[in-house]
Amino acid sequence: WAQAHPRRLSYPAPPDFLGTTFLKQALIELSRDPDVLQEAVQSDSQFARVTEPLWAYLDDLHPHLWREGRDFPKSGPAQVQMLNDGVLDLALSFYPSQASGLIQDGRLPESARTFVFDSGMIGNTHFVAIPYNAAHKAGAMVVANFLMSPEAQAHKAKPDVWGDQTVLDVGELASDKRQLFADIDRGKATLSPSELGPTLLEPHPTWMTRIEQAWQKRYGS
């Protein structure tokens, strides 16, 4: 696609989390043994061997990118602005409803749409934590339980609120709670949960750290 549409693609420069996730997604897709990415990096030689296909891919890809891969968007919002300005044809996001929200806000054209890879995409889940020495643990637990409630999760999923996917298995909820999610107008650019496809596991954090460092040495300005 990049060859057929030169200068119309880019990704945020790592360590921006979207840019780093693009690298991790590519590494999973290109790896001969993706399971090894679930364990910590064992050695410099292992890292070089496992990531060699990634660097070969990027070396081939970058000449076809915006500014021939010599410069990159500084952040996800910067890339979205470039998409809205017609500079790029694609932007990256962790939020399935982000495009619909941006259309509603007038920050993307009505024609913008969301797509995912058939093989799956890296996904994240938000977490809340209560410190061991929290002064008000009981109150914190009440808040955490509320955030996990179907009512709060459905409210968060509305594009004009946050547009974030629920962490709940909607199929396991009572019918009246499932209806909370069914009633959400997700927007014209939002894929349904079934259309999002499989979620790929994040690599072990040591791969992220090493990949960001190696990318900066190879391609950083």
In which residue ranges do the predicted regions lie?
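Short, well-ordered beta-to-alpha junction loops that form the rim of enzyme active sites
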Residues: 13-15, 93-96, 160
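Extracytoplasmic/periplasmic substrate-binding proteins
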Residues: 66-133, 178-181
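Extracytoplasmic/secreted proteins, especially bacterial periplasmic and envelope-associated proteins
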Residues: 17, 21-25, 49, 53-60, ...
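Sec-exported extracytoplasmic/periplasmic mature domains
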Residues: 3-7, 27-32, 59-66, 84, ...
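Active-site rim elements
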Residues: 11-13, 129-132, 198-202
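Extracytoplasmic ligand-binding site segments that recognize negatively charged/polar headgroups
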Residues: 1-77
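Mature extracytoplasmic/periplasmic domains
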Residues: 121, 126, 130-195
